[in-house]
Amino acid sequence: MIDTIKVNNKTIPWLYVERGFEIPSFNYVLKTENVDGRSGSIYKGRRLESYSFDIPLVVRNDYLSHNGFKTHDDVLNELVKFFNYEEQVKLQFKSKDWYWNAYFEGPIKLHKEFAIPVKFTIKVVLTDPYKYSVTGYKNTAISDQVSVVNSGTADTPLIVEARAIKPSSYFMITKNDEDYFMVGDDEVTKEVKDYMPPVYHSEFRDFKGWTKMITEDIPSNDLGGKVGGDFVISNLGEGYKATNFSDAKGWVGAGAKRGLPKAMTDFQITYKCIVEQKGKGAGRTAQHIYDSDGKLLASIGYENKYHDRKIGHIVVTLYNQKGDPKKIYDYQNKPIMYNLDRIVVYMRLRRVGNKFSIKTWKFDHIKDPDRRKPIDMDEKEWIDGGKFYQRPASIIAIYSAKYNGYKWMEMNGLGSFNTEILPKPKGARDVIIQKGDLVKIDMQAKSVVINEEPMLSEKSFGSNYFNVDSGYSELIIQPENVFDTTVKWQDRYL
Protein backbone atom coordinates (compact mmCIF):
# COMPACT_ATOMS: atom_id res chain seq x y z
CA MET A 1 0.00 0.00 0.00
CA ILE A 2 1.28 3.47 -0.88
CA ASP A 3 1.56 5.57 2.27
CA THR A 4 2.52 9.16 2.98
CA ILE A 5 3.23 11.30 6.03
CA LYS A 6 1.21 14.09 7.62
CA VAL A 7 2.93 16.97 9.41
CA ASN A 8 0.53 18.88 11.65
CA ASN A 9 -2.27 17.29 9.58
CA LYS A 10 -0.83 18.61 6.30
CA THR A 11 0.35 16.47 3.38
CA ILE A 12 2.13 16.91 0.05
CA PRO A 13 0.17 15.06 -2.67
CA TRP A 14 3.27 13.92 -4.57
CA LEU A 15 5.25 12.71 -1.52
CA TYR A 16 5.24 9.04 -0.43
CA VAL A 17 7.02 6.79 2.05
CA GLU A 18 9.33 4.29 0.36
CA ARG A 19 8.21 0.68 0.70
CA GLY A 20 10.00 -1.41 3.30
CA PHE A 21 10.37 1.28 5.99
CA GLU A 22 10.48 -0.23 9.49
CA ILE A 23 8.73 1.78 12.21
CA PRO A 24 10.92 2.00 15.34
CA SER A 25 9.26 1.42 18.72
CA PHE A 26 9.96 0.26 22.29
CA ASN A 27 13.27 2.12 22.61
CA TYR A 28 14.20 0.84 26.06
CA VAL A 29 17.87 0.94 27.03
CA LEU A 30 19.21 -1.26 29.84
CA LYS A 31 21.61 0.01 32.46
CA THR A 32 24.10 -2.60 33.72
CA GLU A 33 27.24 -2.55 35.84
CA ASN A 34 30.28 -4.81 35.70
CA VAL A 35 31.63 -6.11 39.03
CA ASP A 36 35.25 -7.28 39.39
CA GLY A 37 35.52 -10.99 40.06
CA ARG A 38 32.03 -11.72 38.88
CA SER A 39 30.95 -13.08 35.53
CA GLY A 40 28.53 -11.03 33.50
CA SER A 41 27.03 -7.83 34.88
CA ILE A 42 24.38 -6.56 37.31
CA TYR A 43 21.08 -5.27 36.00
CA LYS A 44 20.55 -1.69 37.28
CA GLY A 45 17.32 -0.86 35.49
CA ARG A 46 16.09 0.42 32.17
CA ARG A 47 14.82 3.65 30.74
CA LEU A 48 12.94 4.80 27.67
CA GLU A 49 15.28 7.04 25.72
CA SER A 50 14.84 9.56 22.95
CA TYR A 51 16.00 8.44 19.53
CA SER A 52 16.33 9.46 15.91
CA PHE A 53 15.92 7.70 12.58
CA ASP A 54 15.63 8.40 8.86
CA ILE A 55 12.38 8.08 6.93
CA PRO A 56 12.97 7.24 3.23
CA LEU A 57 10.68 9.30 1.03
CA VAL A 58 9.85 9.30 -2.66
CA VAL A 59 8.79 12.24 -4.83
CA ARG A 60 6.49 11.32 -7.69
CA ASN A 61 7.74 13.53 -10.48
CA ASP A 62 6.12 12.99 -13.86
CA TYR A 63 3.51 14.65 -16.01
CA LEU A 64 0.71 12.57 -14.44
CA SER A 65 1.61 13.51 -10.87
CA HIS A 66 0.05 16.40 -8.96
CA ASN A 67 1.20 19.70 -10.54
CA GLY A 68 2.97 17.73 -13.26
CA PHE A 69 6.74 17.65 -13.72
CA LYS A 70 8.63 19.64 -11.08
CA THR A 71 12.16 21.05 -11.06
CA HIS A 72 14.75 20.45 -8.35
CA ASP A 73 14.06 23.87 -6.81
CA ASP A 74 10.28 23.44 -6.98
CA VAL A 75 10.50 20.26 -4.93
CA LEU A 76 13.14 21.53 -2.52
CA ASN A 77 11.22 24.70 -1.70
CA GLU A 78 8.03 22.76 -1.00
CA LEU A 79 9.90 20.30 1.22
CA VAL A 80 11.54 23.08 3.21
CA LYS A 81 8.13 24.66 3.85
CA PHE A 82 6.77 21.25 4.85
CA PHE A 83 9.53 20.33 7.33
CA ASN A 84 10.76 23.72 8.57
CA TYR A 85 9.57 23.94 12.20
CA GLU A 86 11.49 25.00 15.30
CA GLU A 87 9.02 23.32 17.64
CA GLN A 88 7.65 19.79 17.90
CA VAL A 89 5.10 18.79 15.28
CA LYS A 90 2.60 15.97 14.94
CA LEU A 91 4.12 13.41 12.57
CA GLN A 92 1.66 10.78 11.38
CA PHE A 93 1.63 8.08 8.74
CA LYS A 94 -1.61 8.51 6.84
CA SER A 95 -2.39 4.80 7.27
CA LYS A 96 -2.01 4.90 11.07
CA ASP A 97 -4.26 6.19 13.83
CA TRP A 98 -1.39 7.45 16.00
CA TYR A 99 1.29 10.13 15.74
CA TRP A 100 4.66 11.13 17.17
CA ASN A 101 5.62 14.51 18.61
CA ALA A 102 8.68 14.96 16.42
CA TYR A 103 11.44 17.32 15.35
CA PHE A 104 13.06 17.32 11.91
CA GLU A 105 16.78 17.56 11.26
CA GLY A 106 18.55 18.31 7.98
CA PRO A 107 20.07 18.21 5.52
CA ILE A 108 17.66 17.38 2.71
CA LYS A 109 19.71 15.97 -0.15
CA LEU A 110 18.19 15.85 -3.62
CA HIS A 111 20.04 14.80 -6.77
CA LYS A 112 20.83 17.78 -8.93
CA GLU A 113 19.68 15.85 -12.00
CA PHE A 114 16.18 14.66 -11.26
CA ALA A 115 15.33 11.04 -11.91
CA ILE A 116 11.94 9.36 -11.88
CA PRO A 117 11.21 8.79 -9.05
CA VAL A 118 13.23 11.13 -6.79
CA LYS A 119 14.34 9.57 -3.48
CA PHE A 120 15.69 11.20 -0.30
CA THR A 121 15.57 10.80 3.50
CA ILE A 122 14.48 13.10 6.31
CA LYS A 123 15.86 12.66 9.82
CA VAL A 124 13.28 12.48 12.60
CA VAL A 125 14.25 13.22 16.22
CA LEU A 126 11.96 12.04 19.01
CA THR A 127 12.70 13.63 22.37
CA ASP A 128 9.29 12.28 23.41
CA PRO A 129 9.57 8.55 22.56
CA TYR A 130 5.83 7.76 22.77
CA LYS A 131 3.12 7.43 20.15
CA TYR A 132 -0.25 9.13 20.77
CA SER A 133 -3.67 8.13 19.49
CA VAL A 134 -5.17 10.57 17.01
CA THR A 135 -8.52 10.15 18.74
CA GLY A 136 -8.89 11.90 22.07
CA TYR A 137 -11.18 10.69 24.84
CA LYS A 138 -13.00 12.33 27.72
CA ASN A 139 -15.22 11.34 30.60
CA THR A 140 -17.31 13.34 33.05
CA ALA A 141 -17.29 12.73 36.79
CA ILE A 142 -20.45 11.33 38.36
CA SER A 143 -20.76 11.76 42.13
CA ASP A 144 -17.16 13.07 42.10
CA GLN A 145 -15.80 9.85 40.59
CA VAL A 146 -14.52 9.46 37.04
CA SER A 147 -13.08 6.42 35.29
CA VAL A 148 -10.33 6.49 32.66
CA VAL A 149 -9.62 3.63 30.25
CA ASN A 150 -6.21 3.94 28.63
CA SER A 151 -6.10 1.36 25.81
CA GLY A 152 -2.47 2.09 25.00
CA THR A 153 0.64 0.22 26.11
CA ALA A 154 2.13 3.08 28.16
CA ASP A 155 0.92 5.37 30.93
CA THR A 156 -0.58 8.63 29.67
CA PRO A 157 -1.03 12.17 31.04
CA LEU A 158 -4.40 13.81 31.67
CA ILE A 159 -6.06 17.15 31.16
CA VAL A 160 -8.49 17.98 33.98
CA GLU A 161 -11.14 20.70 33.68
CA ALA A 162 -13.30 21.45 36.71
CA ARG A 163 -16.01 24.12 36.87
CA ALA A 164 -16.82 25.30 40.40
CA ILE A 165 -20.50 25.29 41.33
CA LYS A 166 -19.63 26.61 44.80
CA PRO A 167 -16.70 28.62 46.21
CA SER A 168 -13.83 26.47 47.48
CA SER A 169 -10.44 26.79 49.16
CA TYR A 170 -9.00 23.88 47.15
CA PHE A 171 -9.39 21.35 44.33
CA MET A 172 -7.96 17.83 44.52
CA ILE A 173 -7.97 14.83 42.19
CA THR A 174 -6.62 11.45 43.31
CA LYS A 175 -5.80 8.24 41.41
CA ASN A 176 -6.53 4.84 42.93
CA ASP A 177 -5.46 6.09 46.39
CA GLU A 178 -1.90 6.27 45.01
CA ASP A 179 -1.21 9.71 43.56
CA TYR A 180 -2.92 13.06 43.92
CA PHE A 181 -2.76 16.62 42.67
CA MET A 182 -4.09 19.51 44.74
CA VAL A 183 -4.23 23.26 44.37
CA GLY A 184 -5.15 25.28 47.46
CA ASP A 185 -5.42 24.36 51.14
CA ASP A 186 -7.67 21.63 52.61
CA GLU A 187 -6.57 21.77 56.26
CA VAL A 188 -9.79 21.33 58.24
CA THR A 189 -8.50 23.08 61.38
CA LYS A 190 -8.26 26.40 59.54
CA GLU A 191 -11.22 28.74 59.21
CA VAL A 192 -12.55 29.08 55.66
CA LYS A 193 -13.79 32.49 54.57
CA ASP A 194 -13.94 34.41 51.31
CA TYR A 195 -11.37 37.14 51.84
CA MET A 196 -11.45 38.13 48.16
CA PRO A 197 -15.12 38.62 47.21
CA PRO A 198 -15.81 39.62 43.58
CA VAL A 199 -17.13 43.17 43.21
CA TYR A 200 -17.50 43.24 39.43
CA HIS A 201 -16.38 40.37 37.20
CA SER A 202 -17.40 40.48 33.55
CA GLU A 203 -16.52 39.03 30.18
CA PHE A 204 -17.22 41.61 27.49
CA ARG A 205 -20.28 40.08 25.82
CA ASP A 206 -22.64 43.07 26.13
CA PHE A 207 -22.66 46.74 27.17
CA LYS A 208 -25.06 46.48 30.10
CA GLY A 209 -24.12 49.06 32.75
CA TRP A 210 -21.50 50.80 30.58
CA THR A 211 -21.69 54.43 29.42
CA LYS A 212 -19.99 55.66 26.25
CA MET A 213 -17.26 58.24 26.84
CA ILE A 214 -17.94 61.12 24.44
CA THR A 215 -15.89 64.15 25.53
CA GLU A 216 -13.83 63.07 28.53
CA ASP A 217 -10.38 62.31 27.08
CA ILE A 218 -7.99 60.12 29.08
CA PRO A 219 -4.83 62.00 30.15
CA SER A 220 -2.40 59.08 30.12
CA ASN A 221 0.72 59.34 27.95
CA ASP A 222 1.12 55.57 27.59
CA LEU A 223 -2.47 54.32 27.65
CA GLY A 224 -4.78 57.28 27.07
CA GLY A 225 -5.97 59.50 24.24
CA LYS A 226 -9.04 61.08 22.73
CA VAL A 227 -12.43 59.34 22.99
CA GLY A 228 -15.59 59.60 20.90
CA GLY A 229 -15.42 56.34 18.95
CA ASP A 230 -17.74 53.39 19.45
CA PHE A 231 -17.33 49.88 20.77
CA VAL A 232 -18.94 46.92 19.02
CA ILE A 233 -19.03 43.31 20.16
CA SER A 234 -16.31 41.35 18.35
CA ASN A 235 -14.16 38.20 18.68
CA LEU A 236 -17.11 35.81 18.35
CA GLY A 237 -19.14 37.79 20.87
CA GLU A 238 -16.40 37.98 23.50
CA GLY A 239 -14.72 41.37 23.13
CA TYR A 240 -15.03 45.14 22.71
CA LYS A 241 -13.69 46.36 19.37
CA ALA A 242 -13.19 50.08 18.75
CA THR A 243 -14.78 51.57 15.60
CA ASN A 244 -15.74 54.99 14.18
CA PHE A 245 -12.50 56.67 15.18
CA SER A 246 -12.44 60.46 15.18
CA ASP A 247 -10.32 62.49 12.76
CA ALA A 248 -8.29 64.15 15.52
CA LYS A 249 -4.52 63.91 15.63
CA GLY A 250 -2.62 61.46 17.81
CA TRP A 251 -4.24 58.61 19.74
CA VAL A 252 -7.96 58.29 19.01
CA GLY A 253 -10.30 55.57 20.16
CA ALA A 254 -13.39 54.40 22.01
CA GLY A 255 -14.04 54.45 25.73
CA ALA A 256 -16.74 53.11 28.06
CA LYS A 257 -17.13 53.82 31.77
CA ARG A 258 -19.06 52.43 34.74
CA GLY A 259 -19.18 52.70 38.51
CA LEU A 260 -18.31 49.73 40.70
CA PRO A 261 -21.01 48.36 43.05
CA LYS A 262 -18.81 49.40 45.97
CA ALA A 263 -15.57 51.28 46.53
CA MET A 264 -12.51 49.13 47.19
CA THR A 265 -9.66 50.11 49.51
CA ASP A 266 -7.56 47.00 48.98
CA PHE A 267 -8.21 45.38 45.63
CA GLN A 268 -7.13 43.07 42.84
CA ILE A 269 -8.00 44.16 39.30
CA THR A 270 -7.33 42.04 36.21
CA TYR A 271 -7.78 43.21 32.63
CA LYS A 272 -7.53 40.85 29.67
CA CYS A 273 -7.33 41.68 26.00
CA ILE A 274 -6.64 40.06 22.65
CA VAL A 275 -3.99 41.47 20.30
CA GLU A 276 -4.13 40.84 16.54
CA GLN A 277 -0.45 41.28 15.71
CA LYS A 278 -0.13 39.31 12.48
CA GLY A 279 0.20 42.60 10.63
CA LYS A 280 2.21 45.52 11.93
CA GLY A 281 0.59 48.63 13.33
CA ALA A 282 0.23 50.83 16.40
CA GLY A 283 -2.42 50.35 19.06
CA ARG A 284 -3.21 50.42 22.76
CA THR A 285 -5.91 49.11 25.07
CA ALA A 286 -6.31 49.62 28.80
CA GLN A 287 -8.46 49.59 31.89
CA HIS A 288 -8.42 52.89 33.77
CA ILE A 289 -9.32 53.06 37.46
CA TYR A 290 -10.81 56.18 39.07
CA ASP A 291 -11.48 57.29 42.64
CA SER A 292 -14.87 58.43 43.97
CA ASP A 293 -14.20 61.99 42.72
CA GLY A 294 -13.71 60.74 39.18
CA LYS A 295 -9.96 61.33 39.22
CA LEU A 296 -7.58 58.82 37.67
CA LEU A 297 -6.04 56.49 40.24
CA ALA A 298 -4.34 53.86 38.04
CA SER A 299 -4.06 52.59 34.47
CA ILE A 300 -3.18 49.06 33.36
CA GLY A 301 -2.86 48.24 29.70
CA TYR A 302 -1.03 46.99 26.63
CA GLU A 303 0.52 49.10 23.89
CA ASN A 304 2.40 48.67 20.62
CA LYS A 305 3.63 52.16 19.79
CA TYR A 306 5.68 51.28 16.69
CA HIS A 307 3.68 51.14 13.47
CA ASP A 308 6.34 49.05 11.69
CA ARG A 309 7.40 46.67 14.49
CA LYS A 310 5.70 44.12 16.76
CA ILE A 311 7.22 45.17 20.09
CA GLY A 312 4.37 45.41 22.56
CA HIS A 313 4.68 46.23 26.24
CA ILE A 314 2.49 46.22 29.35
CA VAL A 315 2.34 49.44 31.35
CA VAL A 316 1.01 50.22 34.83
CA THR A 317 0.78 53.87 35.89
CA LEU A 318 -0.47 55.40 39.15
CA TYR A 319 -1.79 58.95 39.62
CA ASN A 320 -1.74 61.08 42.77
CA GLN A 321 -4.49 63.47 43.86
CA LYS A 322 -3.14 66.16 41.52
CA GLY A 323 -3.13 63.80 38.55
CA ASP A 324 0.65 63.50 38.32
CA PRO A 325 1.59 60.12 36.76
CA LYS A 326 4.00 57.59 38.27
CA LYS A 327 4.89 54.66 36.02
CA ILE A 328 5.61 51.65 38.23
CA TYR A 329 5.74 48.92 35.59
CA ASP A 330 6.86 48.73 31.96
CA TYR A 331 7.41 45.20 30.65
CA GLN A 332 8.33 44.59 27.02
CA ASN A 333 7.37 41.33 25.34
CA LYS A 334 10.05 38.69 25.16
CA PRO A 335 11.30 37.91 21.63
CA ILE A 336 9.32 34.64 21.60
CA MET A 337 6.16 36.75 21.31
CA TYR A 338 7.19 38.62 18.16
CA ASN A 339 6.31 35.84 15.72
CA LEU A 340 2.89 35.04 17.19
CA ASP A 341 -0.10 36.19 15.16
CA ARG A 342 -2.69 36.47 17.93
CA ILE A 343 -2.05 36.70 21.66
CA VAL A 344 -4.23 37.02 24.73
CA VAL A 345 -2.72 39.29 27.38
CA TYR A 346 -3.56 39.33 31.09
CA MET A 347 -2.44 42.10 33.44
CA ARG A 348 -3.26 42.17 37.14
CA LEU A 349 -2.80 45.00 39.64
CA ARG A 350 -3.15 44.28 43.34
CA ARG A 351 -3.03 46.84 46.16
CA VAL A 352 -2.86 45.84 49.82
CA GLY A 353 -1.96 48.74 52.07
CA ASN A 354 0.94 50.57 50.47
CA LYS A 355 2.18 47.53 48.52
CA PHE A 356 1.31 47.23 44.84
CA SER A 357 1.83 43.87 43.12
CA ILE A 358 1.76 43.39 39.35
CA LYS A 359 1.41 40.04 37.61
CA THR A 360 1.25 39.61 33.83
CA TRP A 361 1.02 36.60 31.54
CA LYS A 362 0.03 35.74 27.98
CA PHE A 363 -1.27 32.91 25.79
CA ASP A 364 -0.64 31.99 22.16
CA HIS A 365 -4.26 32.08 21.02
CA ILE A 366 -3.55 30.17 17.79
CA LYS A 367 -1.71 27.17 19.27
CA ASP A 368 -3.33 27.28 22.71
CA PRO A 369 -6.95 28.41 22.20
CA ASP A 370 -8.01 26.74 25.46
CA ARG A 371 -5.40 28.82 27.33
CA ARG A 372 -3.77 26.05 29.33
CA LYS A 373 -0.10 27.02 28.89
CA PRO A 374 0.72 30.58 29.97
CA ILE A 375 3.85 32.15 28.47
CA ASP A 376 5.98 35.26 29.04
CA MET A 377 4.98 35.55 32.70
CA ASP A 378 6.29 38.31 34.94
CA GLU A 379 5.74 39.67 38.46
CA LYS A 380 6.85 42.80 40.29
CA GLU A 381 6.17 44.60 43.57
CA TRP A 382 6.28 48.33 44.27
CA ILE A 383 5.96 50.10 47.63
CA ASP A 384 4.06 53.37 47.92
CA GLY A 385 6.43 54.79 50.53
CA GLY A 386 4.78 58.21 50.64
CA LYS A 387 1.24 56.77 50.52
CA PHE A 388 0.31 59.03 47.61
CA TYR A 389 -1.84 56.42 45.85
CA GLN A 390 -4.20 55.15 48.55
CA ARG A 391 -7.58 56.47 47.39
CA PRO A 392 -10.38 53.88 47.08
CA ALA A 393 -11.14 52.53 43.60
CA SER A 394 -14.73 53.40 42.64
CA ILE A 395 -15.03 53.72 38.84
CA ILE A 396 -13.49 51.86 35.90
CA ALA A 397 -13.18 52.61 32.18
CA ILE A 398 -12.13 50.56 29.16
CA TYR A 399 -10.27 52.29 26.33
CA SER A 400 -8.88 51.08 22.99
CA ALA A 401 -7.17 53.33 20.45
CA LYS A 402 -5.07 53.68 17.33
CA TYR A 403 -2.66 56.42 16.25
CA ASN A 404 -4.29 58.41 13.47
CA GLY A 405 -2.52 58.27 10.13
CA TYR A 406 -0.94 54.86 10.73
CA LYS A 407 -2.10 51.28 10.43
CA TRP A 408 -3.93 50.00 13.51
CA MET A 409 -2.82 46.90 15.38
CA GLU A 410 -6.24 45.78 16.58
CA MET A 411 -6.47 45.26 20.34
CA ASN A 412 -9.79 44.37 21.93
CA GLY A 413 -10.73 44.15 25.59
CA LEU A 414 -12.05 40.72 26.59
CA GLY A 415 -12.88 41.11 30.27
CA SER A 416 -12.51 43.00 33.54
CA PHE A 417 -12.30 41.33 36.95
CA ASN A 418 -12.45 43.60 40.01
CA THR A 419 -12.06 41.96 43.41
CA GLU A 420 -12.02 43.40 46.91
CA ILE A 421 -9.33 42.15 49.32
CA LEU A 422 -10.44 41.92 52.95
CA PRO A 423 -8.14 41.64 55.99
CA LYS A 424 -7.13 38.01 56.41
CA PRO A 425 -6.14 36.51 59.79
CA LYS A 426 -2.81 34.70 59.85
CA GLY A 427 -3.23 31.03 58.95
CA ALA A 428 -6.79 31.38 57.63
CA ARG A 429 -7.84 29.49 54.50
CA ASP A 430 -8.78 31.67 51.57
CA VAL A 431 -11.40 30.87 48.96
CA ILE A 432 -9.11 30.78 45.92
CA ILE A 433 -11.80 29.30 43.64
CA GLN A 434 -15.02 31.25 43.18
CA LYS A 435 -18.35 29.95 41.90
CA GLY A 436 -18.11 29.71 38.11
CA ASP A 437 -14.31 29.55 38.03
CA LEU A 438 -12.71 26.99 35.72
CA VAL A 439 -9.73 24.99 36.99
CA LYS A 440 -7.53 23.56 34.22
CA ILE A 441 -4.71 21.12 34.97
CA ASP A 442 -2.44 19.86 32.18
CA MET A 443 -0.45 16.95 33.62
CA GLN A 444 1.92 16.75 30.63
CA ALA A 445 2.65 20.48 30.38
CA LYS A 446 2.79 20.63 34.20
CA SER A 447 0.58 23.69 34.32
CA VAL A 448 -2.42 24.69 36.42
CA VAL A 449 -4.59 27.73 35.74
CA ILE A 450 -7.72 28.99 37.47
CA ASN A 451 -9.81 31.23 35.25
CA GLU A 452 -6.76 31.32 32.95
CA GLU A 453 -4.47 32.69 35.68
CA PRO A 454 -1.29 30.66 36.41
CA MET A 455 -1.70 29.17 39.90
CA LEU A 456 1.35 26.93 40.27
CA SER A 457 2.22 28.87 43.44
CA GLU A 458 -0.97 27.46 45.02
CA LYS A 459 -0.08 23.82 44.31
CA SER A 460 0.04 21.76 47.49
CA PHE A 461 3.62 20.87 48.43
CA GLY A 462 2.95 17.16 48.79
CA SER A 463 0.99 16.73 45.58
CA ASN A 464 2.33 16.11 42.10
CA TYR A 465 1.32 15.77 38.47
CA PHE A 466 0.58 12.15 37.55
CA ASN A 467 -0.22 9.85 34.62
CA VAL A 468 -2.75 7.03 34.44
CA ASP A 469 -1.47 3.52 33.72
CA SER A 470 -2.47 1.35 30.80
CA GLY A 471 -5.88 -0.12 31.50
CA TYR A 472 -8.55 1.08 33.92
CA SER A 473 -8.09 3.82 36.55
CA GLU A 474 -10.52 5.38 38.99
CA LEU A 475 -10.16 9.08 39.91
CA ILE A 476 -11.78 10.82 42.88
CA ILE A 477 -12.58 14.55 43.08
CA GLN A 478 -12.55 16.56 46.32
CA PRO A 479 -14.19 18.44 47.93
CA GLU A 480 -17.45 16.65 47.25
CA ASN A 481 -20.36 18.27 45.42
CA VAL A 482 -18.38 21.40 44.52
CA PHE A 483 -17.08 20.81 40.98
CA ASP A 484 -18.35 19.62 37.61
CA THR A 485 -15.26 17.79 36.37
CA THR A 486 -14.22 16.45 32.98
CA VAL A 487 -11.06 14.43 32.31
CA LYS A 488 -9.46 14.22 28.84
CA TRP A 489 -6.72 11.89 27.62
CA GLN A 490 -5.19 10.09 24.64
CA ASP A 491 -4.06 6.48 24.46
CA ARG A 492 -0.26 6.34 24.51
CA TYR A 493 1.97 3.63 23.08
CA LEU A 494 5.58 2.51 23.48
What are these regions (language model features)?
Residues 257-269, 335-343, 466-468:
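Extracellular/lumenal carbohydrate-interaction signature centered on repeated Trp-anchored short motifs
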Residues 296-306, 345-351, 394-399, 439-442:
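Broad, structure-driven detector of short, well-ordered beta-strand segments within folded domains
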Residues 369-412, 467:
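Flexible glycan-contacting loops in extracellular carbohydrate-active proteins
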